């Protein structure tokens, strides 16, 4: 059964705090610090699709930073899994554990059969507003980084009339 999407383009992304690959509490808003953010959700399993999404984001990390964005990844895996993936792939960004799928549910990505619908990418502007989202229905629905870069290059400022943080 699929749950409805709770976050959409134009809405403020809900903040959350989860454990990172080193078992430290990381808050999305604290990490973001008023910068743009590429927020990625992947399954907590070590398969070809998860590795592909991780490697895409790692390979273009410097390009994301050039455009003023950080990267944060949320998985349904535990801290130990995330530590292994983080170390094996030498990731320059944090992997957060949402093993109970609380945040995955909050973002409308939960599927009771697989825990996560498919890989998902949310791009947040500097005010924390979602300016782009891509939610895969299958594990192989992996977002191309070029599309993310185009979003970051474009106007991702807060829409007029949106409350300041």
Q: What is each stretch, according to the model?
A:
Residues 1-165:
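Chalcogenol-based redox active-site neighborhoods
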